[in-house]
């Protein structure tokens, strides 16, 4: 069983913000694999289904970004999911819009949602898919909570699709296979 977590902040005022790209990827996975995310528990909204004949749980924590680890820990403990089978998808300001980076472990890199997950799982060994949202030219908080432009949304459509494919590759093969296949991905469209 795999737990696939998209990081973001709950509430419509955060829709289409850079910090919520993880939620957008989860929504895309939900549509692609017909997995309804309609249950509330574990301080999040989630749904169960299958990807590549493996049972998966799609989770969007509703704790706000900085406490995401609370929700992840509750689901992982309840379903007895090992860290290696927890895939976390989130925004990365160090990557240009339209780029992806997959890692099997590592530090939080200044991302508070990842910092919370590492603290709650007591490990930094879990796969993650970083979706580039670009470098801020304004205050960091205003940037990550800011909305994407129409042009940025067009570029991100491709990134979201490839992030979805990356999740399937991790499940079917492993993290290294996904890294070899998708690391360095850059959307064909540019801004």
UniProtKB/Swiss-Prot annotation:
InterPro entries on file: Pept_tRNA_hydro, Pept_tRNA_hydro_CS, Pept_tRNA_hydro_sf
What's the main place this protein lives? cytoplasm
Cite the position(s) of the site with description Discriminates between blocked and unblocked aminoacyl-tRNA.
Answer: 9
**UniProt keyword list:** Cytoplasm, Hydrolase, RNA-binding, tRNA-binding
**Where in the sequence is the active site?**
19
- Write down the position(s) of the site called Stabilizes the basic form of H active site to accept a proton: 91
Q: From the UniProt record, list the coiled-coil ranges.
A: none
User: Any idea where this protein resides?
Assistant: Cytoplasm
In its UniProt record, a GO molecular function of this protein is: peptidyl-tRNA hydrolase activity
Instruction: Name its GO BP terms in alphabetical order.
Output: protein quality control for misfolded or incompletely synthesized proteins; rescue of stalled ribosome
Is RNA-binding found in the keyword set? yes
Query: According to its UniProt record, which reaction does this protein catalyse?
Result: an N-acyl-L-alpha-aminoacyl-tRNA + H2O = an N-acyl-L-amino acid + a tRNA + H(+)
- Enzyme Commission numbers on file: 3.1.1.29
Highest taxon above the source species: Bacteria
Identify the residues that bind tRNA: 14, 64, 66, 112
Record's GO cellular component terms: cytoplasm
Determine if tRNA-binding is one of this entry's keywords.
yes
Q: What does this protein do?
A: Hydrolyzes ribosome-free peptidyl-tRNAs (with 1 or more amino acids incorporated), which drop off the ribosome during protein synthesis, or as a result of ribosome stalling. Catalyzes the release of premature peptidyl moieties from peptidyl-tRNA molecules trapped in stalled 50S ribosomal subunits, and thus maintains levels of free tRNAs and 50S ribosomes.
Q: Subunit structure, briefly?
A: Monomer.
Q: Which family does it belong to?
A: Belongs to the PTH family.
NCBIfam families (alphabetical) = pth
Q: What is this protein called?
A: Peptidyl-tRNA hydrolase
The organism named in the record is Clostridium botulinum (strain Eklund 17B / Type B)
Lineage of the organism:
Bacteria, Bacillati, Bacillota, Clostridia, Eubacteriales
